[in-house]
């Protein structure tokens, strides 16, 4: 099923526009006003699902329910926070939402250093440069970090970064395992498939540990709780930022185990060591062989939701960087056509 991210009532792109993209049958949505760590009310999830259904589509994925930093840090209050997370997962199941995409990145979610990199065709795209990141002064909070300007005050960020000084990669794995061992059984009982998103970019930033960076890490996740509900989001763009990652092989290995529950299929072009920019979706424009990736997914019997993920800003569109309508719609149609062309059932793309 081809899906499309929608940011709810605040999104300048209405559901009525999205339903006009011929291949799109599902919406990837979330509740954005629930404080991190608080349970998501069933009635709110049902209202979101009903709004999507009124527009002729299904609420296929929730992306995401954020994991509280105290859980990642392994602090004493994590038990209550994990209980709340489990209640949210139960409510997803009660509301009939089959997939939950989430991540375990400390402090920062996906990170870029440029939200409007000018490409040769005069479109703009998201980009990342590790050298540029190193020049960002966090003593002012996140004011200078693109996309994170109002996320943390200087004092709040300092305290959080200080707390992570005692958390190395293995400690973060330990805390993640504790979380999975509590949440995955609840997800399995509730009919919800957990789909962990890889770290983006797939390396440490600002001295913080990042552990979900390659195929071996994703395999390790699936062994912590050996349950079909414990799976991943296969994000081509995130994994491709590291040239050592063999995307088709990762897709085959995890797909054979039935652990790929969601796919983000976007393209990137590596522009140097630990630097990249996002590109149009077709293979020729970046470093992702999209045909090979989708072929690998199809060979394993994957029939889950796929989304075109980020897009460029084209045709003078204004909006949230990476999440305009036009280029993501082009990407959705490209992915749908590619899936059909390699022999996949169009009804499941």
What are these regions (language model features)?
Residues 27:
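Long, His/Glu/Asp-enriched segments that create or flank divalent metal/ion-associated functional microenvironments
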Residues 20-23, 58-72:
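A short glycine/small-residue-enriched secondary-structure motif
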Residues 47-54, 62-65:
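N-terminal glycine-rich phosphate/pyrophosphate-binding loop and immediately adjacent elements
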Residues 31-46:
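Glycine-rich, proline-tolerant flexible connector loops at the mouths of alpha/beta enzymes
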Residues 32-33, 66, 106-107, 201, ...:
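Conserved beta-strand edge residues that scaffold enzyme active sites
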Residues 91-95, 99-177:
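Active-site-proximal, glycine-rich beta->alpha crossover segments in alpha/beta enzymes
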Residues 1-17, 50-53, 70-74, 79-83, ...:
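Histidine-acidic metal/acid-base catalytic patches
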